[in-house]
Design a protein with these regions (language model features):
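Short active-site loop at a secondary-structure junction
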Residues: 283-289, 312-332, 345-347, 370, ...
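Substrate-binding clefts and substrate-entry loops adjacent to catalytic sites
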Residues: 32-42, 122-130, 357, 374, ...
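Non-catalytic, structured segments within soluble enzyme domains
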Residues: 1-210, 217-235, 401-402, 406-408, ...
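Mid-domain, small-residue-enriched loop/turn segments at the edges of structured enzyme/sensor domains
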Residues: 360-364, 392-431, 438, 442-445
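A penicillin-recognizing enzyme superfamily signal
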Residues: 138, 142-158, 188-212, 218-235, ...
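Long, low-complexity, intrinsically disordered segments
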Residues: 618-633
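Conserved catalytic neighborhood of penicillin-recognizing serine enzymes
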Residues: 16-19, 84-96, 342-396, 440, ...
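Glycine-rich, acidic and aromatic/proline-enriched surface loops and short helix-turn segments
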Residues: 2, 19, 23-35, 102-113, ...
Length: 633
């Protein structure tokens, strides 16, 4: 029950503090030390813990700590349990706290090349984050975090989830909630994995104890009175719980039989009558979201929303999840072109282009010619593909790495449309480079760790890299502002300036929407001088997706969350965030006047020693082209 140490145990079992424990309560806790599972007072067989308590009390008499008279009094007392289950699911930033716990464990157990602990106590052992009195200083701003969590809940629970249920309700019954084109074998495989991975199936198949949640190694099969059971074996350190054993046919029947159950409904649970199988399908149709917000000048993470409800969905969609990023990757392609001599005002053909057998299209047509600025504002696929073809996939990959993308990228033309599967963590870090004068600062969430005496045992030392010239970075900001401001007559992010509940933000904002193939993932990246924020929305299973592009595009899924979030942040007088414009680099006007470079090679001499140039403009396809019909969003 996560009762670690006497303080925690006193709270969990008796709802008190150590100084207030009675003799009989103390004896019961001491009795548990040898085998907490066997002597646990919460077991159905209460006689075990009472007998164990009696042993401890008798030892106290033996060694003079208790009189015979008091022994008789305490021996006859009831258990007096006031159970308080410990849960880390509630409270602010639960996803972040779990990532923090794992990172602290990594830091405190880090070793040098010789295998010695880098940070250790005076006795040479590793620090324990729970018991050694450490002080951990993080970058999270609780006020910004509260607004972020509220924004995710507001859009999904009140608007988007209902629209999604309605949108997919028209699907064939046998396919629900998956898209109609899914192959039977794929649907069956996904459902089989979901069934076997469910807690109910793991319990019924003897892989998990229903009481203490111990895994298979603690569980034994037993037979009694002609029936088979599973037992969480006490001889193996289990809790002694027993439950009926079923064969596969019995398990299948259970999964198809409606029972009273609670199902998730954003922000709450509702009681219903549903079969376990239909419950799995229902929960696969739940939309998920993540948000991360960074201060670009420091790399400090101010808000981290890894999902919609940590109690029910533990998977973190900021750090752990990797999803196709869609058009949010296009700014890196455009930045490569600017870095190698293009200008925001340059006209670029949007006519269809084929690179090998890959021929991307634009959603709703839209060919002809565009300026670089307006092509990005309208997320024109063929322009991104043409720029990738002209300036080379290797140069785009090179820049992406300098901007903090650590996940290996597919060196294929369709990378220009965002076929790469990346974590939100990396995308926000890369995008924040544009708002920080071209300087990439690795996103950081731990500032320092102090021991109980106040000595610093760890201090963050993030990677810092001048990935882009400040002038190029400022050009990118001006182009991404057109996505939101509508200065090109349109833009995929212009609804941020509209009249919807989440919109109407008047302050300078740059941005980029993203929508992946078949409306699977919706993204929005929003940039202001003091905060760069990324939002992802989608179902956990990529085969569960919107039918309608109008509903599934990033402008309708991710952007509203960003809008709700920033409106709250701007309205909070306790949060000191700039409402001004992005700072123009010194000498930028001269840079614009003098920028008349006609070849990538000349630009290389002027700007950067580490810029990789492929003069032929040809793309080296080191991997099979992934291909995509990624939407123009």
């Amino acid at each position: 029950y996560q009762a670690v140490g006497i303080k925690s145990a006193a709270h969990v079992y008796f709802n008190t503090v150590p100084d207030s424990l009675t003799v009989d309560q103390s004896a019961m806790l001491v009795g548990m030390l040898q085998n907490p599972s066997r002597w646990n007072p919460m077991k159905k067989d209460t006689t075990l813990s009472l007998k164990r308590r009696e042993v401890v009390l008798s030892q106290m008499v033996k060694y003079g700590y208790l009189s015979e008279e008091d022994y008789e009094i305490y021996r006859k007392k009831p258990r007096g349990i006031d159970f308080q289950r410990v849960s880390h699911d509630a409270g602010l930033a639960p996803y972040f706290r779990e990532v923090l716990r794992a990172k602290l464990d990594e830091i405190l157990n880090e070793k040098d090349e010789s295998g010695e602990l880098i940070r250790k106590k005076a006795d040479g052992t590793a620090y324990n984050v729970y018991s050694d009195g450490l002080k951990v200083y993080t970058t999270i701003d609780t006020r910004i975090q509260q607004h972020a969590e509220w924004a995710v809940e507001e859009h999904l629970s009140k608007e988007l989830q209902a629209a999604f249920f309605k949108d997919i309700s028209r699907r064939k019954k046998e396919n629900y909630p998956f898209y109609n084109g899914i192959a039977d074998k794929d649907r069956e495989r996904i459902m089989r994995q979901a069934i076997e991975g469910s807690e109910r199936h793991m319990i019924l198949s003897g892989k998990l104890c229903p009481d203490c949640k111990r895994p298979k190694k603690y569980i034994s099969a037993i037979r009694r009175d002609g029936k088979e059971y599973y037992s969480c074996d006490e001889d193996k350190g289990g809790c002694g719980e027993e439950w009926e054993k079923f064969d596969e046919k019995g398990i299948e029947k259970i999964f198809n039989t409606p029972v009273k159950a609670k199902v998730y409904a954003h922000g709450a649970y509702k009681d219903t009558l549903i079969s376990p199988l239909d419950s799995i399908k229902y929960h696969k149709a739940i939309l998920h979201a993540s948000l991360m917000s960074v201060e670009p000048s420091t790399g400090h993470i101010k808000a981290w929303v890894g999902g919609i409800d940590f109690k029910y969905f533990k998977f973190d969609n900021v750090y752990q999840s990797r999803r196709q990023v869609g058009s949010t990757f296009k700014p890196l392609v455009y930045a490569t072109a600017l870095r190698m001599g293009k200008r925001p005002e340059d006209q670029v053909s949007a006519e269809q282009i084929c690179i090998g057998n890959w021929c991307p299209k634009n959603s709703g047509g839209g060919y002809g010619f565009y300026s670089m600025r307006c092509a990005l504002a309208n997320s024109v696929n063929t322009v991104s593909a043409r720029l990738m073809n002209e300036y080379g996939v290797d140069n785009v990959v090179h820049l992406a790495k300098k901007m903090g993308i650590k996940t290996p990228l597919p060196a294929v033309p369709s990378l220009s449309l965002g076929v790469a599967e990346l974590p939100l963590f990396e995308m926000v870090g890369a995008t924040s480079t544009f708002a920080n004068g071209g300087v990439y600062i690795e996103p950081t969430f731990i500032l320092r760790i102090e021991d109980k005496n106040g000595s610093v045992i760890y201090e963050s030392d993030p990677v810092i890299d001048q990935a882009l010239d400040p002038n190029v970075s400022y050009q990118m900001i001006s182009m991404m502002k057109a996505v939101v401001d509508g200065s090109c007559g349109s833009g995929t992010g212009v609804r941020l300036r509209g009249g919807r509940a989440y919109a109407g933000i008047p302050y300078p904002t740059a941005g980029k929407t993203g929508t992946t193939q078949n409306n699977t993932d919706g993204w929005f990246m929003g940039l202001t001088p003091d905060l760069v924020t990324g939002v992802w929305v989608g179902a956990q299973d990529p085969t569960v997706r919107f039918n309608s592009t109008a509903l599934g595009q990033g402008a309708n899924t991710g952007l509203p969350i960003y809008g709700y979030f920033m409106k709250k942040v701007y309205a909070d007088s306790n949060i000191k965030i700039s409402k001004g414009d992005f700072a123009k680099p010194a000498g930028y006007d001269d840079y614009k006047r003098n920028l008349n470079i006609n070849s990538a090679a000349d630009f290389d001499d002027l700007m950067s020693d580490d810029l990789m140039v492929n003069p032929s403009g040809e793309i080296k396809e080191t991997e099979e082209d992934l291909g995509t019909d990624e939407l123009n969003q």
